[in-house]
């Protein structure tokens, strides 16, 4: 790990804020803003710097001591260390703070841990003192730019934002923190939502109920420190003295939470700017700031100004030792809270990612003014960028068409604040279906019955929305899926995708299928190959989307990490062994063997025999003793039964006569939606398979046989080698060529892929493999 990044982690994350104390008589235990405790540093160093020896850790400590000094005055502090690190990464051009382009990746890694404002405000305060200046503008963009003008010129040609989650594409931590710091009373229920600690060095502190209470008390202390330091900056002696008394008896803070809220209310009424229709959102966003900061980023300006003023007061000697230590505590608590909302841990997989996603609005939920600011900051700030060509925002369909219409109305009302109508038109929406984890076996119900019902309800509300009124129709462009792939496979959404992609939407003056001139169909994106138990499993999921969901030219696969990851590096990362369910491994073996045969890249004889043997052993375990078959089922037969999974499983409960009749005359069904029960992908080939009773029985058992389900859910270890990795590599290349031929795009998301996947560096991202031809040119 980068030495500066590691040192920042130790002094602001690993060493608890409770250890910051000026008055400890024992020098060996003293830890404060100007003296990092050596014993505590060396205790934490092995987990942060495992590549270094004990002696090297000691050298790192003394290097930290040196780097905490101001090069002009020799004053030493953790704040100066932040400024010195920022000085290596940032530059001030006289107008704005920019990231040095040659430090871009370091800036990403370091600022991701603490937030950009943590460094930018410190850097700006130091520069303003040096240039005898005082910044008034704090509503700068959420993400600062680099100093590479050539890159800006390229980006100014136009950019499309094709994957924009409202809750994940904005300053989530800052919004929650500002709301919490202004509304700290009555928050116990919000902290109880945090079931476990997600940061490695804090997880044990949050996993028990009493520790969740401690986390709330910790944030109460931060709120008290913030209002106290704010009063110091503003010269409000009453709040300063009263809050100071409370800070001297920290054990009394939790029982005096209403008093802290009173301090905040006093500061709000005296200093806070009232935002039209929303009231005072942050007392640190002062009345005299609105002339310079009334834009889409205004909600961020108060906290930035507070950080800037505190850093400046420290550098100018206006804060005493106690106030400096309190600000150090505030930064530590702030960083801890941020780490429970922003994915700064290094765990891979979608579940970890999803746990963070669920927390995005815990502390602003129900606070309408802050919820509006979230939408305003997310949408309007992006739409106002001159180079933004289009913005594709993703939301879940409402439970009813009326609920959806109301949500679009609220969004549009906020977007209308962007005065330029052409900019407003850049925004459109994609409705995504959340994947839901399967429940236990229930007699007569297919796999993922709960997800199928929820998705069908969402589909019906979408169709009713389009039929209801064309006012917002032209704002909805497509459909997608979201949440964990491991919870349910593409087969669950197959019929819904085929149906929704075929309906005709009326954009103006009229409803679905009726009247008007502007008609179109919904576009399709499906998130697949992002999270998987094995690379083969991820590739099969991508193939299932193409086969079952009716994707065609112009459609997109979201992420598709499995399609581009280096199989050798992936399996090496997994120690050449993966753990998955027997059912998934059985499916994967049948799929990979048939893929290899189809593209003419059969593995060597030894590997082929090994894979076939594993298939037959698993098949016998799961199916052989639980179904009736007139002959020995081959790998090809099983693969054919897999091809039927795009069909609605309810069809396979019909008698043979009813099934064949329905297959022959699908148009005679009750509703248009039912006409899409059969998958039409390579229909002639699939119809031959459907007429085979033994293959139909396999598909029926897959869904409705309890013993098959139970046996298939057992876990198994699957060992692979370099020969298997080579086979996967060839299958990947063939699938990439197929995507090119069929005109299906891959929607890449480098930042979330880096967090979810096994790639260690951005230059390992599959996008370089997908675009290798043009890069080589």
Feature map (PLM): residue ranges:
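Metal-cofactor-binding active-site regions of metalloenzymes
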Residues: 1-777
């Amino acid at each position: 790990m980068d030495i500066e990044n590691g040192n920042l982690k130790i002094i602001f994350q690993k060493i608890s804020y409770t250890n910051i104390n000026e008055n400890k008589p024992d020098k060996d235990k003293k830890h404060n803003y100007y003296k990092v405790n050596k014993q505590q540093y060396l205790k934490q160093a092995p987990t942060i710097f495992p590549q270094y020896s004990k002696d090297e850790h000691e050298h790192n400590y003394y290097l930290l001591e040196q780097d905490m000094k101001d090069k002009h005055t020799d004053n030493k502090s953790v704040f100066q260390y932040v400024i010195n690190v920022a000085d290596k990464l940032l530059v001030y051009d006289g107008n704005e703070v920019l990231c040095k382009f040659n430090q871009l990746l370091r800036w990403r890694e370091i600022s991701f841990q603490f937030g950009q404002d943590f460094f930018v405000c410190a850097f700006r305060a130091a520069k303003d003192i040096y240039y005898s200046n005082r910044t008034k503008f704090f509503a700068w963009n959420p993400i600062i730019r680099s100093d590479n003008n050539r890159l800006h010129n390229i980006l100014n040609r136009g950019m499309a934002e094709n994957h924009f989650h409202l809750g994940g594409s904005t300053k989530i931590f800052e919004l929650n923190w500002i709301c919490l710091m202004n509304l700290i009373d009555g928050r116990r229920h919000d902290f109880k939502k945090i079931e476990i600690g997600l940061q490695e060095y804090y997880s044990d502190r949050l996993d028990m109920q009493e520790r969740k209470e401690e986390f709330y008390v910790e944030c109460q202390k931060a709120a008290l420190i913030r209002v106290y330091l704010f009063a110091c900056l503003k010269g409000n002696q009453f709040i300063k003295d009263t809050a100071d008394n409370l800070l001297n008896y920290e054990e009394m803070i939790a029982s005096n939470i209403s008093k802290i809220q009173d301090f905040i209310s006093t500061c709000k009424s005296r200093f806070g700017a009232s935002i039209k229709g929303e009231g005072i959102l942050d007392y640190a966003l002062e009345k005299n700031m609105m002339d310079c900061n009334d834009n889409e980023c205004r909600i961020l300006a108060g906290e930035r100004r507070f950080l800037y003023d505190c850093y400046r007061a420290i550098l100018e000697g206006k804060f005493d030792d106690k106030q400096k230590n309190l600000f150090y505590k505030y930064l530590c608590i702030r960083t801890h809270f941020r780490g429970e909302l922003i994915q700064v841990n290094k765990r891979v997989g979608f579940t970890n990612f999803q746990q963070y996603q669920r927390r995005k609005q815990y502390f602003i939920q129900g606070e309408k003014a802050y919820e509006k600011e979230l939408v305003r900051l997310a949408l309007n700030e992006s739409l106002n960028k001159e180079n933004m060509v289009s913005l594709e925002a993703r939301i879940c369909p409402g439970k009813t068409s009326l609920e959806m219409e109301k949500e679009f109305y609220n969004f549009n009302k906020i977007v209308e604040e962007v005065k330029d109508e052409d900019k407003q038109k850049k925004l459109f929406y994609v409705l995504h279906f959340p994947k839901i984890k399967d429940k236990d076996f229930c007699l007569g119900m297919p796999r993922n019955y709960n997800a199928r019902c929820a998705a069908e309800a969402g589909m019906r509300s979408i169709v009713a929305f389009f039929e209801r009124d064309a006012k917002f129709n032209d704002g909805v462009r497509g459909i997608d899926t979201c949440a964990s792939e491991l919870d349910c496979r593409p087969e669950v959404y197959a019929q819904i995708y085929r149906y929704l992609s075929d309906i005709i939407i009326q954009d103006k003056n009229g409803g679905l299928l009726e009247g008007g001139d502007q008609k179109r169909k919904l576009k399709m994106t499906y998130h697949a190959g992002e999270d998987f138990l094995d690379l083969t499993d991820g590739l099969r999921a991508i193939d299932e989307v193409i086969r079952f969901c009716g994707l065609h030219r112009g459609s997109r696969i979201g992420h598709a990490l499995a399609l581009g990851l280096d199989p050798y590096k992936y399996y090496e990362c997994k120690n050449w062994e993966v753990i998955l369910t027997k059912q998934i491994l059985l499916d994967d073996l049948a799929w990979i063997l048939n893929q290899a045969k189809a593209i003419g890249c059969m593995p060597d004889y030894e590997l082929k025999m090994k894979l076939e043997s594993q298939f037959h052993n698993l098949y016998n375990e799961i199916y052989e003793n639980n179904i009736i078959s007139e002959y020995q089922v081959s790998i090809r037969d099983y693969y054919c039964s897999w091809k039927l999974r795009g069909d609605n499983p309810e069809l396979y409960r019909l008698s043979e006569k009813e099934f064949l009749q329905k297959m022959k005359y699908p148009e005679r069904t009750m509703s248009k939606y039912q006409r899409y029960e059969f998958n039409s992908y390579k229909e002639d080939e699939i119809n031959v398979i459907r007429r085979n009773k033994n293959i139909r029985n396999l598909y029926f058992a897959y869904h409705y046989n309890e013993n098959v389900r139970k046996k298939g859910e057992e876990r198994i270890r699957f060992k692979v080698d370099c020969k298997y990795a080579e086979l996967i590599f060839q299958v990947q290349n063939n699938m990439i060529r197929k995507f090119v031929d069929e005109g299906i795009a891959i929607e890449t998301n480098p930042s979330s892929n880096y967090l979810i996947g096994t790639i260690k560096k951005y230059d390992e991202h599959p996008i370089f493999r997908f675009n290798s031809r043009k890069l080589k040119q």
